[in-house]
């Protein structure tokens, strides 16, 4: 099956408009943002925000959560860098979490997140078929 770039762009724009309207209807605190052509949704603090983000998460191919300890308590203000496999950063956010959803082109990426001086990294492949969920958890020593 050949995918046409114009059709792909229309589908992405339609999805993003749906995301924007859902987010706007939910709360003013949740804001879908676009930085250097990368659309993302960051937040999830409080039950209402968490529920909203979980409801629209399927629109994003890459979904991340950040937590600590054995009980998995959510954390925020986590610096995140997503790089291509050549090491070139394609997305950076100084204060992510506790949930971060990102739209990226299909490909293989390395996601690095830092909390309390410890960096965790995970590789992920986005194939355009199914979204991917990454969970970063910093357990107590």
Kindly label every feature range from the protein language model.
Residues 11-17:
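Hydrophobic helical h-region of N-terminal Sec-dependent signal peptides
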């Amino acid at each position: 099956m050949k995918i046409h770039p114009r059709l792909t762009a229309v589908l992405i724009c339609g999805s993003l408009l749906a995301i924007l309207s859902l987010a706007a209807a939910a709360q003013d605190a949740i804001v879908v943002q676009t930085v250097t052509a990368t659309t993302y949704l960051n937040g999830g603090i409080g039950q209402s925000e968490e529920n909203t983000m979980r409801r629209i998460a399927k629109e994003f191919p890459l979904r991340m959560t950040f937590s600590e300890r054995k009980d998995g308590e959510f954390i925020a203000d986590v610096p995140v860098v997503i790089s291509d496999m050549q090491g070139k950063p394609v997305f950076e956010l100084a204060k992510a979490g506790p949930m971060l959803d990102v739209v990226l082109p299909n490909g293989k990426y390395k996601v690095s997140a830092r909390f309390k001086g410890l960096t965790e990294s995970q590789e992920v492949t986005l194939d355009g078929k199914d979204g991917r969920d990454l969970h970063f958890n910093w357990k107590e020593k």
